[in-house]
Amino acid sequence: MDYVSPGHSVLLLWGGAVSGDTIQTTVGNLQTKVGEKGHVRVEHVDRLLLSNHGSSTFDVVMSGTINPPTTVHSGDVLAEVARLLKPSGRAVVCEPTVSTDNGGTLRTAAKLSSSLKLAGLVSVSEAKEVSLSQQEHDLLKQALSVDGIQVVEVSASKPSYEVGSSAQLTLSFAKKKQVEKPKLDENTAKIWSLSAVDMNDDDIDLLDPDELLDEEDLKKPDPASLKAQCGTGGDTKKRKACKNCTCGLAEELEGDQPGKTASKPATSACGNCYLGDAFRCASCPYLGMPAFKPGEKITLTDRQLKGDI
């Protein structure tokens, strides 16, 4: 009753073994609260999906608020409640729940809140326990055949907009005024642009970089002195290059060895093998291989050297 105000349109849903006198008393109390400008409609919860109520008709929808509540609201019923509510309308749902999920027909209060959110409702309140008389509690236990039942009340609101509604966006394509940058102080800029010319006064002594070099530093070194000292052991010892020689001694010693001639590049008998299969002989061992550069060494496997027959 706290969510009902004068002038509201209220839908009261009932279900289970509720007496007609109790329904009439509840409707009378609601009608008194909404006043002459408001109205109250009554519908059985099982026939809600078959009713012909228009969308966004009611300010408040109350379901299961008549004790003892035995209705377990399905997802379709909650979605229909959300459809019937006006934007920012309120739904009040009372339902029997259990403390732990046992896989039966009753669910926990947390799952009831989740179902309201899945139906499209927002601002779901915390579950509040509804006090029942001993007689109402016995009737509820007899109807559901479940122990440890706890009736809770949860309220939720419909968003302040309709599903599929649109709103015009105010976009401005006018050019924005350029903000003038503050002018820099000339004295501040000079501080960060000091040079040697600015400091050329009597208080500062500047050194000439050429005066830091001696005559020995300016002499051109002898190329012989630049060679590495590796392999120098006098006339009695044989010169030997290092393992990873980088000074050129290894190449020099290799060229000084007598009887060693430079390896000649490999050549073919006909001189056309490197051009490709179109220029090769019928018995050329390079058949089937791609063209290669003249003089390039090509290694053939044992299978290629043997004939097919």
From Swiss-Prot:
Residues bound to [4Fe-4S] cluster: C270, C273, C281, C284
Which residues lie in coiled coils? none
Q: What SUPFAM superfamilies would the database entry show?
A: S-adenosyl-L-methionine-dependent methyltransferases (SSF53335)
Q: Where is this motif: Cx2C motif 2?
A: 281-284
Identify the residues that bind [2Fe-2S] cluster. Answer: C230, C242, C245, C247
Q: Which stretch carries the motif Cx2C motif 1?
A: 270-273
Q: What is its main location?
A: cytoplasm
For this record, the Gene Ontology CC terms, alphabetical, are: cytoplasm; mitochondrial intermembrane space
Location of the region described as Fe-S binding site B in the Swiss-Prot/TrEMBL record:
270-284
Where are the stretches annotated Fe-S binding site A? Answer: 230-247
Which residue positions does the secretion signal occupy?
Answer: none
Residues of the region (Linker) are 170-218
User: Recorded GO terms, molecular function?
Assistant: 2 iron, 2 sulfur cluster binding; 4 iron, 4 sulfur cluster binding; electron transfer activity; metal ion binding
GO terms for biological process, alphabetical: iron-sulfur cluster assembly
Q: Where in the cell is it found?
A: Cytoplasm; Mitochondrion intermembrane space
Give the cofactors, semicolon-separated: [2Fe-2S] cluster; [4Fe-4S] cluster
Summary of subunit composition and partner proteins:
Monomer.
Q: Which family does it belong to?
A: Belongs to the anamorsin family.
Q: What does this protein do?
A: Component of the cytosolic iron-sulfur (Fe-S) protein assembly (CIA) machinery. Required for the maturation of extramitochondrial Fe-S proteins. Part of an electron transfer chain functioning in an early step of cytosolic Fe-S biogenesis, facilitating the de novo assembly of a [4Fe-4S] cluster on the cytosolic Fe-S scaffold complex. Electrons are transferred from NADPH via a FAD- and FMN-containing diflavin oxidoreductase.
Q: What is known of its domains?
A: The C-terminal domain binds 2 Fe-S clusters but is otherwise mostly in an intrinsically disordered conformation. The N-terminal domain has structural similarity with S-adenosyl-L-methionine-dependent methyltransferases, but does not bind S-adenosyl-L-methionine. It is required for correct assembly of the 2 Fe-S clusters.
Q: What is the name listed in the Swiss-Prot or TrEMBL entry for this protein? A: Anamorsin homolog
